[in-house]
Amino acid sequence: MRSDMIKKGDHQAPARSLLHATGALKSPTDMNKPFVAICNSYIDIVPGHVHLRELADIAKEAIREAGAIPFEFNTIGVDDGIAMGHIGMRYSLPSREIIADAAETVINAHWFDGVFYIPNCDKITPGMILAAMRTNVPAIFCSGGPMKAGLSAHGKALTLSSMFEAVGAFKEGSISKEEFLDMEQNACPTCGSCAGMFTANSMNCLMEVLGLALPYNGTALAVSDQRREMIRQAAFKLVENIKNDLKPRDIVTREAIDDAFALDMAMGGSTNTVLHTLAIANEAGIDYDLERINAIAKRTPYLSKIAPSSSYSMHDVHEAGGVPAIINELMKKDGTLHPDRITVTGKTLRENNEGKEIKNFDVIHSLDAPYDAQGGLSILFGNIAPKGAVIKVGGVDPSIKTFTGKAICFNSHDEAVEAIDNRTVRAGHVVVIRYEGPKGGPGMPEMLAPTSSIVGRGLGKDVALITDGRFSGATRGIAVGHISPEAASGGPIALIEDGDEITIDLTNRTLKVNQPEDVLARRRESLTPFKAKVKTGYLARYTALVTSANTGGVMQVPENLI
């Protein structure tokens, strides 16, 4: 066993003394059992994580029952909804790397035989997956699950995106103070990840198709008995996989990454999944081209439109058959998935999901009647984004295939929000927000406040927004993010000026500023070099090492320093 490194031999008697002092080992014979880490992310201020202590206790009991010894440790977590719209958002994406580094440190320092990961919200799930790829120790994931959708006084389903859009609607005067406060109290009624197809739930669904989690991981409610039983079954399966030496890199192959993007397309997942899945591929040693994502989009139908793109919540998806029903439907179209891959169950993707039929065709459409013949995400290229940009086409009004408008440029999120709120931004504008990428932000802040204000003011069809920052999974509208290279790295988005004509072509997947190359070249000559906004602490180190979004926004040590 891997853990023999810390518990076998006379020279490790001091380590054994310390292990006995933990109280986890009940007798000397326990030293012969596998040591299993429980990588938890319990934290009081994140509603998606407040119940994870209880789930970890269930996992511990099941791991002991299966004949192994559990040891729990915790990671940090940032709630993107609470950190939104202020300097706290700079820390959200960078927290992914801290989580990966922290988990790697504990797992490798103590030579665990396996790891039970309990994530739930936005950056915690991908951070833990990065750690799993890096350490390549037998592992299983079981997230905390989604919360129930709220209910407005008018009987309308509410999610967190409803609340962000309500801010714009309230400023516009289209809803009353009483209605606004009622929504605030009822939008998030239980613990769990936010109820729509936002980043957390997108990633937790993708773990099913990647093969790292059990079926229904992405949709079973946080407060359900099914979630607690899933934790137990995952613990038993992990101990079995330790004995069989089934490792994460055996499961997460190039084909698994393809299938993750295919499910993302079918469910209209968050644009952040592109960022995180590229980072996962990078950590797994898989060279993955953005162009590949468009090829997947073209062959994958859009089957389930979930909040914020509709009124359906994750619980509705679960009741309609969950991710297994979507995977089963996609498997009926040859070439869409790679169903004979091994998964954490020890069975193939096909064996896990075959025969799981759709129970509600309003929530999950069939191949015969998709929302769209092509997937809900697109990668755009052009002279603004030579290395790519991302748009959630599933969140764009279906009548819009192209949008051409005049640029109105802002060098920060806050400047843009102020201009939208004071009505400087009008119909026909393309809002350009730059210097908000991984290096420029720093931390690639989410642009949910400006996009929600645009939609809340009733301009969702009439104003577009492009940025080198990113979006919340709750974003909808004509919103293009992840523009690469970013402005801070000298990307062409830095060259756009007010009044430039910009065209977003969703059919041909292009993003262009309609200016001659010689004009852009002259502008580049006078471009002021970017200066880091943060000079000390973690964000200073992050700024120095982070890459643009097209590589997943990962931190890389320059080759000359290795």
UniProtKB/Swiss-Prot annotation:
The active site is at residue 472. Keywords: 2Fe-2S, Amino-acid biosynthesis, Branched-chain amino acid biosynthesis, Iron, Iron-sulfur, Lyase, Magnesium, Metal-binding. It is an enzyme of class 4 (lyase). One of its GO terms (molecular function) is dihydroxy-acid dehydratase activity. Its cofactor is [2Fe-2S] cluster; Mg(2+). GO terms for cellular component: cytosol. The keyword Ubl conjugation does not apply. PROSITE patterns: ILVD_EDD_1, ILVD_EDD_2. Pathway: Amino-acid biosynthesis; L-isoleucine biosynthesis; L-isoleucine from 2-oxobutanoate: step 3/4; Amino-acid biosynthesis; L-valine biosynthesis; L-valine from pyruvate: step 3/4. SUPFAM superfamilies: IlvD/EDD N-terminal domain-like, LeuD/IlvD-like. The modification N6-carboxylysine is found at residue 123. Homodimer. This is Dihydroxy-acid dehydratase. The lineage of its organism: Bacteria, Bacillati, Bacillota, Bacilli, Bacillales.
